[in-house]
């Protein structure tokens, strides 16, 4: 290669044969299409276990081994050293279910080595979150908000938002409730506390004994309950200025915001007509 003074090599894995001469190999290495060995797509609003399942589906790693790695304190310690502004002692709070919950950014990740190590796969997702945190660093500082709290707020917005929802208004409801010392009463935190996925939270579920249960505890939960897209990050740091303290989702996905319990109850009576409709923000 040095003899041929070649350059412009493509990264990736290539299949070469013994019959190829130097010119043929150089041509292969410089002109071959850049095709990834595999890709992993992580959608918004996914919990760590769901992401582990996604990674397992595209690799030879089992979901169990992936979760073990994600919860491994030595691995987390290395991440803290490499990403000190993102991974802090906040993730080691004794009340947190999984330290890296919410820290694996939703995106499509391309990997060109079929033998990519699990650490590298996870770190690719952490790095994306770190870059986003750097982008919003000034806004977080202006709001005196840690990255961990910003991620937590963003995760609540992500889990509550529908396609038609105004995330900035949902954000304002959460901030208004916190300022009034009202519990957030957001259903996704109850489901996270229970470790369940279902369409409707029952009254008995609201009694879940967990620091994540925002019906029983005021303020934010101990940490994120899922990952969040950038739109939810942005909404978490830029809530609309409103007086809303309630909201509910109609069956068609439209979100109705109200300022008083009386208005909220009227909206419930008008729009929540059967058990398939899901009440929010009460």
Regions picked out by a protein language model, each given a short descriptive name:
Residues 1, 70-76:
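Short, glycine/proline-biased beta-turn/loop segments that scaffold the active-site neighborhood
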Residues 18-37, 43-58:
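Membrane-embedded segments
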Residues 61-71:
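Extended intrinsically disordered, low-complexity coil regions enriched in Ser, Thr, Gly, Ala
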């Amino acid at each position: 290669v040095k003899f041929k003074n070649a350059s412009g090599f493509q990264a990736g894995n290539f299949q070469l044969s013994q019959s190829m001469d130097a010119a043929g190999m150089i041509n292969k290495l410089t002109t071959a299409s850049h095709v990834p060995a595999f890709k992993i797509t992580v959608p918004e609003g996914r919990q760590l276990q769901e992401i582990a399942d996604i990674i397992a589906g595209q690799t030879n790693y089992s979901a169990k081994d992936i979760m073990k790695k994600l919860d491994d304190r030595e691995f987390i310690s290395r991440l803290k050293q490499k990403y000190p502004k993102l991974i802090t002692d906040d993730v080691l709070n004794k009340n947190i279910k999984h330290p890296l919950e919410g820290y694996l950014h939703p995106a499509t990740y391309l990997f060109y080595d079929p033998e990519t190590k699990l650490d590298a796969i996870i770190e690719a997702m952490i790095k994306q979150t770190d870059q986003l945190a750097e982008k919003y660093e000034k806004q977080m500082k202006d709001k005196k908000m840690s990255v961990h709290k910003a991620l937590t707020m963003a995760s609540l917005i992500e889990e509550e938002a529908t396609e038609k929802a105004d995330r900035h208004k949902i954000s304002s409801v959460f901030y208004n409730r916190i300022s009034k010392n009202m519990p957030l009463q957001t259903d996704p935190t109850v489901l996270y506390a229970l470790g369940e996925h279902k369409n409707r939270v029952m009254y008995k579920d609201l009694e879940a004994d967990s620091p994540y249960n925002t019906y029983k505890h005021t303020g934010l939960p101990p940490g994120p309950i899922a990952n969040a897209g950038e739109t939810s990050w942005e909404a978490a740091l830029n809530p609309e200025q409103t007086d809303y303290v309630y909201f509910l989702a109609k069956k068609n996905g439209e979100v109705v915001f109200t300022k008083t319990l009386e208005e909220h109850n009227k909206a419930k009576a008008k729009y929540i007509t059967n058990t398939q409709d899901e009440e929010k923000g009460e």
